[in-house]
């Protein structure tokens, strides 16, 4: 049973210590026995055994009740166990000296036997090593108990057994037992007559012993895991355990099973432990109860047994239970101290019995007791026993735990150490409260001298205790001083051997220069037997050199800038990454991109390649920029490594067949490429050198008339200041070139301020040729060009710019307001400067920078090297949007609305948020965006469909179509413009009902002569300074413009606004075509339709109202004087503004303006027409007298009253109210369509009989029917009568002849060489194309740039198959539901199938009036399908060509044509 189950502390369990034998009783004690188990178990000759790791000790105690006596009537002598080697053994296995562990005649003694080593089972129990035997601290106690009667009855029978049995036989211990010899299956003859019932009882007992042993083995494992970590009860006891562990072997009580059947075979080459009993007088051993160790134990351990000093005989102590009764009476009371008492002495083992003489006291002398203390008897620890402790004597202590004995016996020489330890333990404990000291815990006996040879002193001291014993604290020792290497002492004498030692070649330099020189050595610092004096080379250095230092200790003369690797926490901008691109120059003009790619592909993967071309001829410049993505797959490295390798390997190589050697350099950011292109273009197209002025040309002062005209009034302090400073012009300098009609050079001021130097545009890249081409009329009194020092060039016609999507001309305002950064004064400068390139005049509707090729992308870093004007910034920042629109923005927005209302057609609005940063020359839009006007209703939708979300310089355009809410432009000038809502005549307002059937009406072209309205504006010059308080009249000059331009300005100019500094003239031109294309900031297009008239007319507009300097917008009211015949009277009709945009809506930060739907005029004008049918005459008033501004009260109209009352909320409500009033005047009742469904006719494709779309199911609508109701579709249905009339009429014949002449001319010029040239140019630079929804059917292909007639558009590519395969594929495509056919027949055998393998060229739709044609050419023996332009294609125009399908006779197989052209045949085949 485990110790913890009986209340025994595992740390104090009796493992490894000698335990008192339990009282007599019928039961056997096994395992760990608590004190209560000792009391309850009365056993006879019990056996207690302890098993250690390498030793085992067994001894027996006689029974208390009937003590067994020897033949002399005395108690047996004390037992004595020797080591596992035992006494000296002879060759015949006999101990030397006659000590044999043999059983005698059964009377308790021992005598010598030859081969027998077994003992009597009546007095001892033979110990067997079990297979399940655990480690040393496991205790197993078992004994076979018999009654005394049984032992006396079987004693004689037992000793009469046959002595011929094997000496190593292991039999059970107990008389009357059945003994079985090893290897023999029969029962011993002496045991045949014993009692069978006793045999069965003993068999059952053996079985139970085996079961308990198995159970104890499992309990041992659990006990050992706890005992390893159990603390020691007290420091004193721990020291005692350590001391006992070093000097004594552990003692344990154990017994094994008596069954010989379970005994394992003996261990070979191991001598048994023999017991020496007391000898008789005649020299024979006295038989006594003793202990026998079998031969299979792990290792033998000797226990010291005391001897008599007189006879030198072993003395066997009496068992502890002999004086049990007397001991109980003398049991002292347990101590009450704080600390537990020391364990009692072990001299109880040597206490003599009552029949023997007491042994001499071998204990060390008791130390003297301290003063005022009385000796006290030792007491047992009260914490070790349970409630039945009073039944046990004092002399039965529990020995300490796990006290391990050494494997060899301890010699007597170590008694002195033990005595000193005992004396130390017997000293008084200073921690006791009463100051008394305890006696020594143990008294040690002298160890026999016969074992000295087996236990040397050093072995006993070197034994270590078990792991469970806490070692004593080490003594404090002084650390030894560190070891110091002794100094080296050379030997007393050394002899130098010649030729051996360190040497130095003295004539090394001479040897190198002259190979025949003999080498001289200096050995051991001696030359010629003399020691060479060595000098320090540093002494030869100057003081400056020594102060500066050398090597790592060199001092710096100045501070060095430290550089660190850039990371996320650096404050400086991130440096550019290592270059991964190269620039190749020196290429031949015929070198293609494929050749360059093939040449560079082995070095790495190419990410981008840009071959620079001439922008005028689209030919190669011999410059190519290549960017690498990385090394080839499977190779290590980076793109920078590839670029560096390409520079090393490819520089100076040849690519093309021309033999030109290329030059390759690193160019990571493309700056070198830009510079190379610039230099090459300047080399090809050098700028023209301006002609020098004559030496006699001088700058003459201004005349008085000019001074009076251009200067301020006389009351100004600086009125006499000339217009142009004399220091501005230098006679020796080259004069810039100026166009005819220009008043002054660009950049020159017209006012009395320090003028800026004139801008010379010959070498300036940022200029606008279209502005220079615009004429200016030189008025009277202006400065002559000869006086200003400019050379007059011969005049030439104005350059015609390419039109936009609708061929509408572009207009630009010649000037705008800005700050002068040179003089830091406010003023105005002409805005003709442009940052477009000097080799090409760009269209204003497109980006200002054209891409070099389709492969390249624009680099912002290249702009750092571009020349620029000191005051011109090519990339100004976008203006910060204020919280609300300013007054200037309101004026601009009003002008835009007026232009939209007068145009009357839908317009496209480009949101300013989608535009890139505004440049100076592009600032002609309102603060909300750009408005683009067109001459018809369909162009705006087409432009929005094609160009919406188009990327321009990295920004996506956002196009929104705004439908004009105002009336269409008036075509009859005889109808006066009314200012009231009720004054509208019948027909002016067209009542619209918004339904799906309604389609926009086409614009009607009006014919008539153009008229020019000249307007004279008198405006005060307002300024905050003293010298700007005067008014300067400016005369508006007449000019005649080119027919293709629509020149117009804002009706409310900049200088008519608050705080304007000067006067600006305004002109309004009336074009008979009435077309506009662009409305920009500070330049608003206003369409004024000239009316039909048989007579010439003279129109004069006088401004009789000017604006006050109070921040109120100027209400310009003009007077139109009509002279009819000779009549002098004139009628003035005043116009007033009816409605305006609500200011509060603009201040709320709206992103887009409210759709202008008002159809009313903003001014009242009285127009008097002349009856004469003559040319238009312009009258100029010579005498112009500025008049002071007049305040005029604005008369409120009916509309103003409605707005004030809240009936009308905005301009849109007023517009629809006017429509309703106009319909009432016509006698029409308004039709309110709210809540009504849009009904269609029965013949309409969308008509449904059931009234519900879902009830009709799904059906396919033909493409022809879709064109009837879809607004984005063309009119595909063409009447056959109209077609016949057109084809047979005179107009058709004329058109056919003209087309035939053009075709013949193109055919004469287009040869095979020209086609190949065009094809090669397409491979160099592809045209910019885009596919989008087509108005004909499905998707279509649109041109994104201007493509002139005869130029190649694209190539029709696809899969080339045979004709039979094409027929099979066509049927399969029809079954798969692919309705479109992309099969293009090249000849009778080959067909190009672009259904799954094609480009955007397959999306080109058919048209009976095509804009392109397809040709089949051969390149290197291979047929190519190439699309050429028949006429000029403008950006946004769809590319169409005639499919030329063969005609079908069967009407069921014919495909209707949806092109909607005037010459449409109606069918494709």
From Swiss-Prot:
Biased composition (Basic and acidic residues): 64-74, 100-117, 127-138, 148-165, 172-222, 676-685, 816-836, 1054-1068
Residue sites binding S-adenosyl-L-methionine per the record: 1443
Low complexity bias: start-end ranges: 250-262, 371-382, 411-427
Keyword S-adenosyl-L-methionine listed: yes
Extent of the signal sequence: none
Annotated Pfam families: SET
One GO cellular component, as annotated: chromosome
Keywords per UniProt: Chromatin regulator, Chromosome, Methyltransferase, Nucleus, S-adenosyl-L-methionine, Transferase
Boundaries of every Post-SET domain copy: 1453-1469
GO biological process, one term: methylation
Stretches with biased composition (Polar residues): 291-300, 455-464, 963-973
Biased composition range(s): Basic residues: 1006-1017
Occurrences of domain SET (ranges): 1327-1444
InterPro entries cross-referenced by the UniProt entry: COMPASS_Set1_N-SET (IPR024657), Nucleotide-bd_a/b_plait_sf (IPR012677), Post-SET_dom (IPR003616), RBD_domain_sf (IPR035979), Set1-like (IPR044570), SET_dom (IPR001214), SET_dom_sf (IPR046341)
Region Disordered, annotated ranges: 1-478, 676-699, 805-839, 858-891, 963-984, 999-1068
Localisation per UniProt entry: Nucleus; Chromosome
Listed GO MF terms: histone H3K4 trimethyltransferase activity; RNA binding
PROSITE patterns in the cross-refs: POST_SET (PS50868), SET (PS50280)
Catalysed transformations (reactions): L-lysyl(4)-[histone H3] + 3 S-adenosyl-L-methionine = N(6),N(6),N(6)-trimethyl-L-lysyl(4)-[histone H3] + 3 S-adenosyl-L-homocysteine + 3 H(+); N(6)-methyl-L-lysyl(4)-[histone H3] + S-adenosyl-L-methionine = N(6),N(6)-dimethyl-L-lysyl(4)-[histone H3] + S-adenosyl-L-homocysteine + H(+); N(6),N(6)-dimethyl-L-lysyl(4)-[histone H3] + S-adenosyl-L-methionine = N(6),N(6),N(6)-trimethyl-L-lysyl(4)-[histone H3] + S-adenosyl-L-homocysteine + H(+)
CDD domains with a match to the protein in the record: RRM_spSet1p_like
Subunit structure: Component of the Set1C/COMPASS complex.
PANTHER family recorded: HISTONE-LYSINE N-METHYLTRANSFERASE SETD1
Family membership: Belongs to the class V-like SAM-binding methyltransferase superfamily.
Name used for this protein in its record: Histone-lysine N-methyltransferase, H3 lysine-4 specific
Taxonomic source organism: Cryptococcus neoformans var. neoformans serotype D (strain B-3501A)
